């Protein structure tokens, strides 16, 4: 489902612990880390899509989380030119997203990255609230900064001083010319996850 402007409706998920740290996951067979996200089906509301993506990508169910809030309207980002498939009947140039802030209320042992036959992630860890803005792939940094800036007051209502004001380094991380790189896997990751048995090739970006 792509709108007339070329953007695919999508939901993003910021899953937070009580202390303000957020869920950060590595994509299968790629060196990029990101928040859970995924496209909406034509018959879904944003909330329905969020719960579906949450279960597909993390194994968590509605009873394991509390919805603290969401961004109003759509937040957009464009895909880099190399990722745009110009030969498609409907050309997707980017994503328009509603971002949800969830608090983990269940035990983190409920996280199952291999809940589906085609997992999105293979490892995950907890990171500081603003960390993702500086470490996600460059073309997503702007939308991450806008989403987290909006959700931060809601997060502070739970975590208090565990969620600080956006640091200068994060505010500048998505500006042109910034040199910070995105996360890359360690040879022995200090993370939770599993190792896929066999590579099947990279699919389209979600």
Curated annotation (Swiss-Prot):
Span of domain Nudix hydrolase: 6-149
Cofactor: a divalent metal cation
Keyword Hydrolase listed: yes
CDD domains, per the entry: NUDIX_Ap4A_hydrolase_plant_like (cd03671)
Stretch forming the signal peptide: none
EC nos: 3.6.1.-
Keywords of the record: Hydrolase
Record InterPro entries: NUDIX_hydrolase-like_dom_sf, NUDIX_hydrolase_CS, NUDIX_hydrolase_dom, RppH
Region of interest called Disordered, as start-end residue ranges on this chain: 175-206
Motif (Nudix box): 38-59
GO MF, any single term: pyrophosphatase activity
Top-level taxon of the source organism: Bacteria
Family of this protein: Belongs to the Nudix hydrolase family. RppH subfamily.
Name of the featured protein: RNA pyrophosphohydrolase
The species this protein was found in: Stenotrophomonas maltophilia (strain K279a)
Gene: rppH
